[in-house]
Amino acid sequence: MTDPFTSDGAKMPPKPFTVEEGRRQVRSFVLRQGRFTPAQQRAFDDLWPRFGLDYTGAPRDLAATFGRDAHKVLEIGFGNGAALRFAAQQDPSRDYIGIEVHAPGVGRLLNALDEDGSTHVRLYHHDAVEVLEHEIADGALDEVRIYFPDPWHKKRHNKRRLIQPAFAQLLVRKLREGGRLHAATDWADYAEQMWDVLDATPGLVNRAGPRGHVERPAWRPQTHFETRGQKLGHGVWDLLYDRDSGIGNRKGNCPRRPDNPQRPQFSLCQFPIPDSPFPAPNGHRADADQRYEARPRAGRFHDGDVPVRAHSRRRGGIDRAGGLGRHRTGGAGRIVRRFLR
């Protein structure tokens, strides 16, 4: 395989992909420099030929890859691999494919799969969109799982989110009829975008009804990102969609909201939700938003009885001793004014 590091130790980032046709190329990920341990490097050197799939840009015969014809489950962005490893341990009758761009997580999962003696898991260290477009045949997947993708919570970064109309249409093509899409997020705003995109995608039917979510299914363990989000007061939303081209959210075939005739209100059919031994997600969207707004704010202090917010991200900071209207020069020669809030 291609080593995730060059000879001088620099990472080799995957090529960017186009989110929308006709627009500039936008990545849904940024490769952050993380700690790559010697054990993870050895995993790439020794275990990649056993578990890894090199990106070739040509269609791949998955039945030949796994040596059997079984249900194929794809997890996009598996992180440290905890959910993918759990699923492979719980259901060895299925074949699992994982895609991740961050080398440390891939190396960690390679070691875990070797420890488990897994034979039904294969990994890509590449951009998921390119893999789906060029290596996965249409209708080849029984399930796609996307757990806690990067929320890109700043407004100007929302365009980098993975769940976009073009990507949803790509998933519909790759799922077989009757297949399943399972997405999870702990950001209320991202859950809203997922509903906006997926509920309106032809061929996808929300199991929980319009803009609905389900309890955490038995096949998904609690992940690291989920635990971190709950500590910050976030809710968790699991969205399940069935691949059904005959009914559901299609233009001209779906009732529409009276206040907005351009948006579908609900799908024409619903499917039973699988039982889960896990408790329901904590909180509703409104409760999560309230907890988020009430969270402790870093960089706040008081001048007497007047609360003031410090611009802690600017070098040079704020002259806390000055009075109203005082100012000082910032780290880049800027004039940083001080405002009461």
UniProtKB/Swiss-Prot annotation:
InterPro entries: SAM-dependent_MTases_sf, tRNA_(Gua-N-7)_MeTrfase_Trmb, tRNA_methyltr_TrmB_bact. One of its GO terms (molecular function) is tRNA (guanine(46)-N7)-methyltransferase activity. The active site is at 150. S-adenosyl-L-methionine binds at residues 75, 100, 127, 150. PROSITE patterns: SAM_MT_TRMB. Disulfide bonds: none annotated. Its EC number is 2.1.1.33. One of its GO terms (cellular component) is tRNA methyltransferase complex. SUPFAM superfamilies: S-adenosyl-L-methionine-dependent methyltransferases. It catalyses: guanosine(46) in tRNA + S-adenosyl-L-methionine = N(7)-methylguanosine(46) in tRNA + S-adenosyl-L-homocysteine. Pfam families: Methyltransf_4. Substrate binds at residues 154, 186. Pathway: tRNA modification; N(7)-methylguanine-tRNA biosynthesis. Keywords: Methyltransferase, S-adenosyl-L-methionine, Transferase, tRNA processing. Residues 156-161 are annotated as: Interaction with RNA. The keyword Transferase applies. It is an enzyme of class 2 (transferase). Catalyzes the formation of N(7)-methylguanine at position 46 (m7G46) in tRNA. Belongs to the class I-like SAM-binding methyltransferase superfamily. TrmB family. PANTHER family: 3-DEOXY-D-MANNO-OCTULOSONIC-ACID TRANSFERASE/TRNA GUANINE-N 7 - -METHYLTRANSFERASE (PTHR23417), PENTACOTRIPEPTIDE-REPEAT REGION OF PRORP DOMAIN-CONTAINING PROTEIN (PTHR23417:SF14). This is tRNA (guanine-N(7)-)-methyltransferase. The gene is trmB.
